[in-house]
Amino acid sequence: ETMITDRSADSLSSGGDNDIVIEILKAGWSVGYFPELSLVHIIPQERLQISYFARLIKDTNKSWVQVLEKHQINPWHKISSWTVPLRKAKSWFKIAAWKNKINYLNWKAACGYYEGLSK
């Protein structure tokens, strides 16, 4: 039995799509990538803000690690939860998150991985 993980409440986690694909593969089916297909996605203005992208990337990375863990295909070692704030602080400086928006988003992505890997 599996529980598909996806967005709920204020969380922007989006592991549901990946979870579905992994379940399809485990059931013996095939999946495909078709670059000639296109999709028009109408996005509200508030979702084009750095603050939204920061939450989205953090929650997406956290849920991705959790989906991999659930399916026992996570290539990374779990980390102690008490180390997460220290790792985030170290990454803030290593990535220089204060310098520009891209660095800040990269830092938020790292934060999501740490949260997903914590026990």
Sequence positions of predicted segments:
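Short regulatory "switch" loops immediately downstream of catalytic or recognition motifs
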Residues: E1-T5, E69-H71
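Acidic donor-binding loop at a coil-to-helix junction in glycosyltransferase catalytic cores
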Residues: M3-I20
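Short, flexible active-site loops
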Residues: M3-S8, S38-E46
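C-terminal catalytic/acceptor-binding lobe
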Residues: D19, I42, E46-K70, T83
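Hydrophobic residues within well-ordered alpha-helices
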Residues: I24-L25
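Catalytic beta-strand/loop signature of glycosyltransferases that borders the donor
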Residues: G28-I43, F53
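Non-catalytic, C-terminal membrane-associated alpha-helical segments of glycosyltransferases
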Residues: R55-K62, I73-K119
